[in-house]
From Swiss-Prot:
Protein name listed in UniProt: Cytochrome b
Cofactor(s) listed in the protein's UniProt record: heme b
Main localization, broad class: mitochondrion
Annotated source species: Blarina carolinensis
Gene3D superfamilies named in the record: Cytochrome Bc1 Complex, Chain C (1.20.810.10)
Function, as annotated: Component of the ubiquinol-cytochrome c reductase complex (complex III or cytochrome b-c1 complex) that is part of the mitochondrial respiratory chain. The b-c1 complex mediates electron transfer from ubiquinol to cytochrome c. Contributes to the generation of a proton gradient across the mitochondrial membrane that is then used for ATP synthesis.
Signal sequence bounds: none
Amino acid sequence: MTNIRKTHPLMKIINSSFIDLPAPSNISSWWNFGSLLGICLIIQILTGLFLAMHYTSDTMTAFSSVTHICRDVNYGWLIRYLHANGASMFFICLFLHVGRGLYYGSYMFSETWNIGVLLLFAVMATAFMGYVLPWGQMSFWGATVITNLLSAIPYIGSDLVQWIWGGFSVDKATLTRFFAFHFILPFVIAALAGVHLLFLHETGSNNPSGLSSDADKIPFHPYYTIKDILGVLILILVLTCLVLFSPDLLGDPDNYTPANPLNTPPHIKPEWYFLFAYAILRSIPNKLGGVLALVLSILILAFIPLLHTSKQRSMMFRPFSQCLFWILVADLLTLTWIGGQPVEHPFIIIGQLASILYFLLLLVIMPITSLFENNLLKW
């Protein structure tokens, strides 16, 4: 009798994706982040579901409903902080996952990569709308500033902003629709993640060498299931420490003040994971230019496969490209720091230089260096 996992219509999908899947024998821990992102998504959907049971999306009661969750609901504080810090863990895993893809040339699987870029946009949109829901000062002003950026679009801009707001300012209609979208988008993300995996399993995984691993495959289970469990345990340990010891480490104190349209906070800034893009936005004095740069800072990832000029796929054997990659990482960390600083000297000029370097590295310096490396190897 054939094993049920190979014959049952549902089981055989799971079997071919997580059990008998042929995987390269040399993939490192950098390949763990896909499963970690899956775990993060599950944590976010579950904690979010329980929060939604107690949350009210009304401007008069939103802030107090979050307070009620933390004070009166059994383990409500735990659920709330798991959800808030779970988002931070989600983005840490996302950035490392994208960084791995850039370093090892995984973007050559263009369908998988482009679905990934789409996923990144969807997660960013979800996180932004989630940040508005507690209806604190930074929620309100963050929503006002970011949605207002759309008014830079010629001709339709101001109508578009009013259409998103559902009125002439960020108010009850905005909060209600943001809650609705924040609830539905994670399920869209889950579906997209399924498509992401579908395209990945068409080609099989990349590996650190960037060479074909068809000659040397091992089954996903037990080798990579055990390896993934280690990653999951580390993720849960870090998240638990964050939630139990310093739940507000990555948050903004301004969000503990109820939203007040008459009082602007001295420094409006988004959550830490958007600061790099926010710094790029602020570094351009023109509103439309800033918005375009903001969108391009993420959208540029979609053009990475077209900018690949090297004869080798991975950066494993390309020391010059490796140096540039780590300069890019340092540049992004600099942008993240600048995004959280006030708009004054010397932060303005540092932000502008870091923004220019970011685009120069990805669009010009790295492709030219790849050609130079080809030349060195007489390829």
